[in-house]
Design a protein with these regions (language model features):
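FAD-site-proximal beta/loop scaffold in flavoenzymes
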Residues: 2-10, 129, 135-153, 248-300, ...
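Beta1-alpha1 glycine-rich phosphate/pyrophosphate-binding loop at the start
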Residues: 5, 11-84, 169-195, 265
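Conserved N-terminal Rossmann-fold NAD(P)-binding element of oxidoreductases
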Residues: 16-17, 160-163
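Residue-level detector of alpha-helix initiation sites
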Residues: 19-20, 123-125, 166-167, 292
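A Rossmann-like FAD-binding core segment of flavoenzymes
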Residues: 81-100, 105, 112-113, 176-274, ...
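Glycine/small-residue-rich loop that forms an oxyanion/phosphate-binding "nest" at active or ligand-binding sites
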Residues: 88-150
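Proteins that catalyze or organize thiol-disulfide redox chemistry
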Residues: 338-378
């Protein structure tokens, strides 16, 4: 018989989804003494933290002049949110009911009520499902040229972009600043981009457009080395040397939980008030890529998380729904991050801790628990 789900008290604010938007919203809400509850999510990205968890190196996030590993950046932002009192549930939200107040959120183990909600579930980059795609994701394959194109691994190397729209053309042009040459793989005989953008790409001597070309697979050893393609005009298979492959075939917003509950655009992105985080339902806010089909950057997501938290705080206060916590200390204790962890051993090992360090903890967790594991090698 399945365990009965726990019914919790009504929360001030629940944040669904992690990543820069969710964690930043949590920082601001926690510092406002709202003690937000953040449901990190696993299903869409496979691990909490959003798309930056699959980015090897981030060089365009303010405050890191020498760059920072994507997982390390998310670890730091998460630690800051927890330090100020954010409560974490490392599960997926299975269903959300916005038809009555307080709102109802169901996870695999809990039934949660909340007076307000911030949605930061993000958008997932569309993939092609190639045989070796997973093996080379973040090892040559990326879904964001602006995020990753300038990293050392791609400099002065042959690069490729898949897609034929404006985004694909923009990324191909952008990559010519860093790569030795860019191959644009287009399935049809014509670009779908605007005429001006198409003209610029076709006139660029550093870009080769491969018309009617289908990407079949990616090949390499530890890092991507070449692309296996099929030319439709000859029906022949061919190989293209490339150390980097960038997908520009669109994103799918993770909004299935809100179907017929909140207004979306034709692509499924949540609609908000212009320049603001309010959705079509009072007390519900959107932050990050779930409502952003254009910019999709870590720093813009973080900024939108800040706005969503401030708006939620004001709304809760205005409607006298906020129950503020009282802190024992004005300044909370220092945050624990992966860099401050002590190495786990037989005496201090705790299987319930989110972060562990060392081979002892890895062996114990691998053999004795069913938890999904995420490894960071330092």
């Amino acid at each position: 018989m399945p365990a009965e789900k726990k019914e919790l008290k009504t929360e001030n604010l629940v944040i669904v989804g992690s990543g820069p938007a969710g964690y930043t919203a949590a920082i601001y809400a926690a510092r406002a003494n709202l003690q937000p509850l953040l449901i990190t999510g696993f299903e869409k990205g496979g691990i909490p933290g959003g798309q930056l968890m699959t980015t090897t190196f981030v060089e365009n996030f303010p405050g890191f002049p020498n760059g920072v590993q994507g997982p390390e950046l998310m670890d730091l932002i998460k630690a800051q949110a927890v330090r100020w009192g954010t409560k974490l549930i490392e599960e997926d939200a299975i269903s959300i009911d916005l038809s009555k107040r307080p709102f109802s959120i169901v996870t695999s183990t809990q039934n949660i009520k909340s007076n307000s909600l911030i949605i930061s579930t993000g958008a997932s980059a569309n993939r092609l499902g190639l045989k070796n795609e997973k093996s080379f994701w973040s090892k040559g394959i990326s879904a964001c040229a602006i995020c990753d194109g300038a990293t050392p691994q791609f400099r002065n190397e042959e690069l490729a972009v898949v897609g034929g729209g404006d985004s694909a053309c923009e990324e191909a042009e952008y990559l010519t600043k860093y790569g030795s040459h860019v191959h644009l793989l287009v399935r049809s005989k014509k670009l779908k981009a605007s005429a001006a953008m198409a003209d610029r790409v076709e006139a660029n001597s550093n870009i080769t457009i491969h018309w009617e070309t289908e990407l079949l697979d990616v090949l390499g050893d530890e890092w991507l080395e070449k692309l296996k393609v099929k030319r439709k005009d000859t029906n022949q298979e061919d190989e293209i040397l490339a150390k980097g492959l960038f997908y520009a075939i669109g994103h799918t917003p993770n909004t299935s939980l809100f179907t017929n509950q909140l207004s979306t655009d034709s692509k499924g992105y949540l609609l908000t008030e212009p320049g603001r985080p309010e959705t079509s339902l009072e007390g519900v806010y959107a932050a990050g890529d779930v409502a952003d089909s254009e910019w999709r950057q870590g720093v813009t997501a973080a900024g939108s998380g800040c706005k969503a938290a401030l708006a939620a705080e004001r709304w809760l206060s205005k409607n006298k729904l906020a129950t503020l916590i009282k802190r024992d200390e004005l300044e909370p204790s220092k945050a624990e991050t992966t860099k401050t962890l002590e190495i786990s051993n037989e005496e201090n090992f705790d299987p319930e801790k989110t972060w562990q360090k060392g081979s002892y903890a890895l062996r114990k967790l691998y053999h004795e628990t069913q938890k999904p594991l995420f490894l960071i090698y330092t």
